[in-house]
């Protein structure tokens, strides 16, 4: 085995991970090392489903010889991570599932049509990003479709809360130049429900990427098929940056968040919440709630508030608060 070397996890699979050694050419597939994870790093498996994810900085060793195989010996401290609860079912129901680590920005991709715009998913991810300290942005895709929702009111709502927004079409190329400029030189992730066009956007930004794209409607119901089988960081040589493409997710959990914390993920509530009659106001039906008054006056977007109310019902009450 070689001495410990630093590297970046660029692909996560069921049993092995591809690591790019520091200093190697990201465009050179021959530079990648296929690594297992040392058993001692799995000691937290009862609490965490995946000990290693794409974006992780690691120390690894490599076997002597041409096979380019090795082992991850250490996972370096993460600056951030996006997590969700393990999807329901099986023994891992309540375990944490980290999706990607060390992001510079998480882009939430939603479609303006086919499938229809999903504001609840969009607002869920934005709240999760704020809770976990990750910069986020919004990509409104499929603007070229004749039945597309008007993007300008949406752009106004999200830009008003300091969230960058790109209105794009992977088919016509509309808006891609501005998006490419924001991707340069950093690590980003695309997250979105199945069928919104994440893989198509990546292929339009960097032609030649080996992505399998399924047409919306292949399985009926206006939803695309899950086309990405492994979480992977893609190097975009024209951009000189990394973009993560993760398998389509039908649910993104607000991992570790309690009800009283949700309003922190809706930044437009903050200035109004200071005027609520009760300090522990959850902004539902409490008397003297300044947030609901602001919604009625049109000072807070009604759809954003509807997302907040729906998400609030999903979250647990802090045990300490429940005992008071």
PLM regions with names:
Residues 199-211:
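A conserved segment at the C-terminal end of the G1
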Residues 119-167, 308-309, 314:
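Charged, amphipathic alpha-helical linker segments immediately N-terminal to NTP-binding catalytic cores
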Residues 1-23:
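Accessory interdomain/linker segments of ATP-dependent helicases and helicase-like nucleic-acid enzymes
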Residues 145-196:
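Canonical P-loop GTPase G-domain recognition
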Residues 26-38:
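A short macromolecule-binding patch
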Residues 3, 15, 31, 40, ...:
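Helix-rich effector regions associated with P-loop NTPase G domains
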Residues 108-111, 139-141:
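Conserved beta-strand segments of the P-loop GTPase G domain that flank and frequently precede/overlap
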């Amino acid at each position: 085995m070689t001495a410990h070397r630093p590297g970046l996890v660029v692909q996560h699979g069921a049993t092995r991970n591809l690591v790019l050694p520091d200093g190697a050419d990201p465009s050179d597939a021959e530079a990648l090392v296929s690594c297992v994870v040392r058993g001692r790093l799995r000691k937290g498996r009862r609490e965490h489903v995946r000990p290693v994810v794409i974006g992780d900085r690691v120390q690894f060793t490599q076997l002597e010889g041409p096979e380019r195989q090795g082992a991850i010996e250490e996972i370096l401290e993460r600056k951030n991570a996006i997590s969700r609860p393990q999807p329901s079912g099986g023994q891992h129901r309540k375990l944490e599932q980290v999706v990607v680590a060390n992001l510079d920005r998480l882009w939430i991709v939603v479609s303006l049509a086919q499938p229809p715009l999903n504001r609840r998913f969009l607002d869920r991810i934005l709240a999760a990003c704020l809770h976990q300290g990750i910069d986020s942005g919004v990509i409104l895709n499929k603007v070229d479709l004749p039945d597309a929702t008007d993007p300008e009111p949406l752009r106004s709502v999200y830009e008003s809360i300091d969230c960058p927004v790109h209105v794009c079409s992977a088919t016509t190329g509309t808006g891609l130049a501005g998006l490419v400029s924001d991707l340069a030189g950093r690590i980003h992730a695309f997250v979105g429900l199945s069928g919104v066009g994440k893989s198509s956007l990546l292929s339009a930004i960097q032609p030649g990427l080996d992505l399998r794209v399924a047409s919306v409607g292949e399985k009926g119901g206006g939803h695309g098929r899950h086309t990405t089988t492994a979480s992977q960081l893609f190097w975009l040589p024209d951009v000189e940056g990394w973009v993560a493409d993760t398998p389509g997710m039908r649910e993104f959990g607000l991992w570790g968040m309690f009800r009283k914390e949700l309003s922190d993920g809706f930044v437009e509530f903050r200035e109004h919440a200071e005027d609520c009659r009760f300090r522990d106001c959850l902004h539902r039906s409490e008397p003297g709630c300044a947030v609901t008054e602001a919604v009625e006056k049109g000072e807070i977007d009604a759809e954003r508030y509807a997302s907040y109310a729906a998400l609030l019902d999903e979250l647990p009450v802090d045990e300490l608060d429940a005992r008071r």
